[in-house]
């Protein structure tokens, strides 16, 4: 930052030749100083730390993260080990900042063992693997559920439709694929190799993590991390606080050469003066982050780099590379700065003098004590008198003294249990030195036999000494050659890394591929940012919202599919076709693979979500029972999914089942599948129709079709259904629709019946074709094809063995959209062989045409080609569109002659509730109230669009949704809304018309 003051004389002297007056110089310097201060404040994001921190703790976190984040230490609440918790939040943000934050699926980040509710509330593009390894994990999940419920209840609009993205699987068992991962204090339970194996299972190449670090763990059995006020201690097992007194040599040997210890050693972390929860972790896992360098696993080599060690926290990164790794010596060392002023002293650990241990003592204390002991030693005095002299000096050098009324610490206090043994060891050391010096002197005057024995080679003398030690162990102190041990201030680890991974990794090709992918994604993000900036500039300043917007994933045909489950053995036929020299066959095979993977992930996500709820409610994989707080768990999940319910073995449901809803499957200890009335099971919204796994399996069993795909891309109301009716030939054709409602409409248009045997045989949904037996045909007529995934369309053609597909749809209306935000959808867009346009509408009245043109101009990026800029209407109705403001849902005029559409499910639910209050027939609120997405393809005389909230809703800004809403009517369209919504495309265009 700039200094807070400046010297006017120096400014004039240095700038006077430029002709500026003193006042101008002052103004210029003040402006520059202010700008620099503003830039300093803006350079980091705001991070609010609510924990109460001491002045010292505040300095620790500011020194570590103050330069990167705009820290706001609000001192709101006391929390257990508050600094560690505050650092954990900053560590999470710091590790996430290492990766792209585009919000695209290809930039998904995994969090091994993290807090999923933190990412959910902050809108992070993160999937958490949060396994339930014990009671503490289940307690944390329960607490997170409560926090999530509390936040959602305070601001339901912000979280409308959002689901927390996490699973309860161990990291190595989760199937979500992502290139990046973080592990915030999660490595204690996995170790270095465990993290590498989890990365391999997820297809992860870079992981960044943190953990508590103290190099003295390699030497000591206990210690303190002063910045965290944390004391650590090695114990042999979780139930016996016995010290690990393994000698240093044994510890280093075990560290370097052995992976197996006789007894499992744990490290207990306790926070000093805080009677709160402590932590116990396996020493082998912790040690692996200090000693290991690389690990080769399933064709990948993973290397760890220790990046920053600050405030007792080590930040590390693990990077996986494929292919061959040539031999290389990897070296790192761990320093022990806390023992540089100490020396090791061996003292007795047992009364028989057989067991000895090493203690640390200040070099200055030992040096002065030994000097006095050597000078005052007299072999004619009783050993106890000399022992008392040593103890007196030792006490004086390690106690508190008072000088001129001021207390001063002399040296360092010695453990009361070691004090007398230290003095005794110094006495023995002194006596041994005098005896050794005496023997050296006597050798000058020794007899010939003594001289001959002394002249023996050292190996012979060592042999005799070893024999005496083995036969007479209690004599060992007399022959002890070393009492003092020089303590090394570091330990070094060298490891040769070499791995034959098969093919060489083509880094150049990978760099070109990543660059191409990044350019494509960057253009998408730039367009989204420009659109958001234009929206903000068009809004009044006092109404700008600070809430973050998560960019939506955009299909990109230049990159590979990430996020699907890899099942190569089951995809051999389609996989081979993806390498076909015929481009369209390769494209169709790739799309079918993606569609199969997408449906499989939908199924896996459903199972994962239900298993999570089952476990939260106290269930397991063995018993058909739940033991948790059912009401609390299900009330919490009900806020995000109103279809969540529990069926008891008595046949009773916890909540009333909505009318007309029948659950086809349920979940319990036997997994997901059909259940009987006598079983205990749970359900959610995905259990009504659960056919994703079957669709995936069927698609995998097919081959990509080679027939011709023709698309008629027509405007809304151009007569697509009429065209299907005119060209349909029962002997050679089958009509396929995207959903059940469209199938019923086509059946009524062709056969005047929606459920007759003939109508159901010739007009079927795409799902019905794939899941049921059906005859082969030569031609498929597809209605509203844009609602289908390209892979599903190809699967339908393959199942029917059709040589031609004639597809009708509007490429600018609502297209197929993923129901799983974590899936990287890239090949869903239809790729036709032939395309024809139809720009004349017979449905939409005359005044709708200029409205849609205006919407296209405002919503679509400049340069975008749209057939709606030139479309025309043949309707005789000239004026049809009106709008009015309403105060609440009670003022919506519900009329059985009108068709009602909403943008959101919440508004639809409000209208249905209002219809029930007015005792309108069930057929009305079942068939006459739909969302815009559900009403695509529908044609009605009178349509009313209802918006009951003025909170942010991006659907009112999207051209495709607004286009569908405004083109469903033939006679009248009425827009009824509550309040003003910034960016409401329909309202703005109606106002300008």
UniProtKB/Swiss-Prot annotation:
<dbReference type="GO" id="GO:0004386">
    <property type="term" value="F:helicase activity"/>
</dbReference>
<feature type="domain" description="(+)RNA virus helicase C-terminal">
    <location>
        <begin position="839"/>
        <end position="993"/>
    </location>
</feature>
<keyword id="KW-0808">Transferase</keyword>
<feature type="domain" description="Alphavirus-like MT">
    <location>
        <begin position="72"/>
        <end position="290"/>
    </location>
</feature>
<dbReference type="InterPro" id="IPR027351">
    <property type="entry name" value="(+)RNA_virus_helicase_core_dom"/>
</dbReference>
<dbReference type="InterPro" id="IPR021002">
    <property type="entry name" value="1a_necrotic_phenotyp-det_dom"/>
</dbReference>
<dbReference type="GO" id="GO:0005524">
    <property type="term" value="F:ATP binding"/>
</dbReference>
<keyword id="KW-0472">Membrane</keyword>
<keyword id="KW-0489">Methyltransferase</keyword>
<keyword id="KW-0067">ATP-binding</keyword>
<dbReference type="GO" id="GO:0008174">
    <property type="term" value="F:mRNA methyltransferase activity"/>
</dbReference>
<dbReference type="GO" id="GO:0044167">
    <property type="term" value="C:host cell endoplasmic reticulum membrane"/>
</dbReference>
<feature type="region of interest" description="Disordered">
    <location>
        <begin position="537"/>
        <end position="565"/>
    </location>
</feature>
<dbReference type="Pfam" id="PF01443">
    <property type="entry name" value="Viral_helicase1"/>
</dbReference>
<keyword id="KW-1043">Host membrane</keyword>
<dbReference type="GO" id="GO:0016556">
    <property type="term" value="P:mRNA modification"/>
</dbReference>
<dbReference type="Pfam" id="PF01660">
    <property type="entry name" value="Vmethyltransf"/>
</dbReference>
<feature type="binding site">
    <location>
        <begin position="714"/>
        <end position="721"/>
    </location>
    <ligand>
        <name>ATP</name>
    </ligand>
</feature>
<keyword id="KW-1038">Host endoplasmic reticulum</keyword>
<dbReference type="InterPro" id="IPR027417">
    <property type="entry name" value="P-loop_NTPase"/>
</dbReference>
<comment type="subunit">
    <text>Interacts with RNA-directed RNA polymerase 2a.</text>
</comment>
<feature type="region of interest" description="Methyltransferase">
    <location>
        <begin position="50"/>
        <end position="409"/>
    </location>
</feature>
<comment type="similarity">
    <text>Belongs to the bromoviridae replication protein 1a family.</text>
</comment>
<dbReference type="GO" id="GO:0003723">
    <property type="term" value="F:RNA binding"/>
</dbReference>
<dbReference type="GO" id="GO:0016817">
    <property type="term" value="F:hydrolase activity, acting on acid anhydrides"/>
</dbReference>
<keyword id="KW-0378">Hydrolase</keyword>
<dbReference type="GO" id="GO:0016020">
    <property type="term" value="C:membrane"/>
</dbReference>
<dbReference type="Pfam" id="PF12467">
    <property type="entry name" value="CMV_1a"/>
</dbReference>
<feature type="region of interest" description="ATP-dependent helicase">
    <location>
        <begin position="712"/>
        <end position="975"/>
    </location>
</feature>
<dbReference type="InterPro" id="IPR022184">
    <property type="entry name" value="CMV_1a_C"/>
</dbReference>
<keyword id="KW-0347">Helicase</keyword>
<keyword id="KW-0547">Nucleotide-binding</keyword>
<dbReference type="GO" id="GO:0006396">
    <property type="term" value="P:RNA processing"/>
</dbReference>
<dbReference type="Pfam" id="PF12503">
    <property type="entry name" value="CMV_1a_C"/>
</dbReference>
<dbReference type="GO" id="GO:0032259">
    <property type="term" value="P:methylation"/>
</dbReference>
<comment type="function">
    <text>Involved in the virus replication. Contains a helicase domain and a methyltransferase domain. The methyltransferase domain is probably involved in viral RNA capping. Involved in the formation of ER membrane spherular invaginations in which RNA replication complexes form.</text>
</comment>
<dbReference type="InterPro" id="IPR002588">
    <property type="entry name" value="Alphavirus-like_MT_dom"/>
</dbReference>
<feature type="domain" description="(+)RNA virus helicase ATP-binding">
    <location>
        <begin position="687"/>
        <end position="838"/>
    </location>
</feature>
<protein>
    <recommendedName>
        <fullName>Replication protein 1a</fullName>
        <ecNumber>3.6.4.-</ecNumber>
        <ecNumber>2.1.1.-</ecNumber>
    </recommendedName>
</protein>
